[in-house]
């Protein structure tokens, strides 16, 4: 009671207007242990609010100086931008030079704050916790598959919070996961559209599907191409694949640009060490990847391993400003060749490590010698017993939530994998009809082809489409996503589709019915069973895949000297949902120094 009295001495009694109300630690403790009258007769301390950017709203008079936020920023996020100034009654928590926190994890301080001093700026006065429907699901903003809770009020997603999962995201989530949810309310496709007289006009489902079917019938199957986007679940991708099989067409792709994938065994295209396994490692080598932007929660684990054990971290290619110290070993493919040929000092460090980790990014595999880089590193690790039953040092870091699942579904044919036939046909304008399933990041310029776009947002794909078929976003339909470790997790619908939008697999059913007078799948249950049967080394939901015996394969690996440039990701604008989000737009403007900071914000 005494401690509570001290804590509440300077605390304003503004619970009714505080966003933390109903889920506040201080409120709960006061309820159990507090007294109903204050003996504090002096003037209460008042502190001016600080600017912490577009994500965190401050009311520093409520602050009880627990310094959780300071410790989080320094120790977990690795961006020491919060601190305390003054002493005694004049102590204040603030950012240096009053500017927004430049971290991809900054929103987690809101969950850590035990009072209402730090709250979510986009969520201010939106709802009370008991009014919201809460759904436990997974995130699809990157390939990590962070466990999240989606809070909805009727159709609207009001906020997204983390769920503790020690194997994946611990208790943190990235700012993009947490704050891009306002993009789910904007730029939505709610009715089918058909392009008439060079203008998109609303139409009925029947009219749109009749036009689509007639178009498909009039075109040779070799001249039809399909591209699957970055947030498509396993079931919808499988129904798309089956639909293309009915059309007798093999031109399917999911990569947004060329990069090498060896899909012969599962360990070639997943993060074998596992996210939790990063903490056990004693040396990390990054090749052509910037984990801070490509997989924020993987970067947080690397930061944790570095902070706890000071493990040495090396990089080939310059990833820019990471949240830990690292050494650049070089920036071209020849530097990898030198390591493998024992020509550099680093070779000894790698061999003396007991549990090294090598993380290969899409930027390295996108080179002409991407195949050489991957296969030779794999051979090297096998030869030196770094790929065993207990430890696999080889890790591929995909950037999209759907990547691993789509490789499992064999969307890549062997032929396509070797020579990127989809991209070649696309560049040579060989497609007369292009079907985009939630695909907004493909570098595509409309020429003469007929484009069908099926997705949730009026983004880059819908912009150039001749027919638009509206489908739900990830929060509005059930589906399985396989994360970068190869762990299948269910994404559960927390809301419902907007307007006349239909689930993707039901749309393919409608088209197939018009084409062949029968459904592709009779119900979602049979589609789910078919999808689970396709998963390689399936070991049950939420579990890592079964270990497999590696096949001996000989490859002709052509080496070319090339510079390894890590492709810069527009982090806050990486997909259709985040591009529709005003909050993400504000974050991006600050990142690019377009917004005034500090008191002028």
Tell me the role of every PLM-derived stretch:
Residues 1-345, 352, 362-364, 566-601:
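N-terminal export/assembly segments and adjacent metallocofactor-ligating motifs
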Residues 521, 529-530, 553, 573, ...:
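Intrinsically disordered, low-complexity segments enriched in Ser/Pro/Gly/Ala and basic residues
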